[in-house]
Amino acid sequence: MPDGFASHEERAAFIAGLPKAELHLHIEGSLEPELLFEFARRNRVAIPFASIDDVRAAYAFTNLQDFLDIYYQGMGVLHTEQDFFDLTAAYCARANADSVRHIEIFFDPQGHTARGVAFETVITGITRALDDAEARYGITSKLILCFLRHLSEAEAEATLDEALPFLGRIAGVGLDSSEVGHPPAKFERVFARARSLGLKTVAHAGEEGPPEYVREALDLLKVDRIDHGNRSLEDPALVARLAASDMTLTVCPLSNLKLCVVDDIADHPLKIMLDADLKATVNSDDPSYFGGYVNANYQAVADALDLSRDDLVTLARNSFTGSFLSDAEKARHLAAIDAYA
């Protein structure tokens, strides 16, 4: 039996109701095939799929770049403020069903402005849906603007310029897209500028890239959180540093499986991270492409790694303590976890 539970079913029910935050979610990565077809029809965009089954069959990846190729293709159906509203509203409904009480979501404006979609169109649609989710479900949110690392720092600077009128709705900046060959050092100046504007900073590092990329994210980008961070475990000194500094890692188990970062979910390093006192969290990354929202990720690692009640509570607590909420808001959520557990 799982430690702290009478059965696997009891653990699953515990996960379902456990209050949690999600800190690593790309809103464009929550585009379900049904919505893909709806937006394509709505905007008269041709897509290379005849059916929803065709789309799901295409969601077979061997690495990050395989996924990114189809991710950007899917993004092409998003044109209007209503599209971004509907996309975000659909994710928020799923998050609510998974007992998610706070979300910090990434958006990729460069993937839209390059297609002629205005920055304002993107952010207004997303924030309208986030406001609606707070009113409807009580879910609070933060928005993180991600720079695409396969593009230049100058292009990131231009995107930050476009964001200036909307800084009241943007909590931070991040770094995503193709990791290998695009080290954090490439974006040192634009991250410094973002910090000077009062924005939080996060970066994808150590997913496919080496531990050195995690060090660069810490030392050069001065990030508040590391997104993924799996390969940090290859460097004991880095692990010790991350643990000593209470650096949150936003880990994405089903993403790691789908992108072949791990060969089997039983090989996932999440439990090793917890045992090393790393502040790991569980997140869904791009759930429509990787086969599961946040509770499915919790369930997958709970089953494969035989996580205990204490492990699950730690993961949920980490998701709030690692968030960009105020200390008072964090305390309220931690009290809710304690009352539930």
Curated annotation (Swiss-Prot):
Name listed for the protein in its UniProt record: Adenine deaminase
Entry similarity comment: Belongs to the metallo-dependent hydrolases superfamily. Adenosine and AMP deaminases family. Adenine deaminase type 2 subfamily.
Organism of origin: Sphingopyxis alaskensis (strain DSM 13593 / LMG 18877 / RB2256) (Sphingomonas alaskensis)
Tagged with keyword S-adenosyl-L-methionine: no
Top-level EC class as recorded in UniProt: hydrolase
Site (Important for catalytic activity): H228
Binding-site list for substrate: D286
GO biological process, any: hypoxanthine salvage
Active-site positions on this chain: E207
Disulfide bonds: none
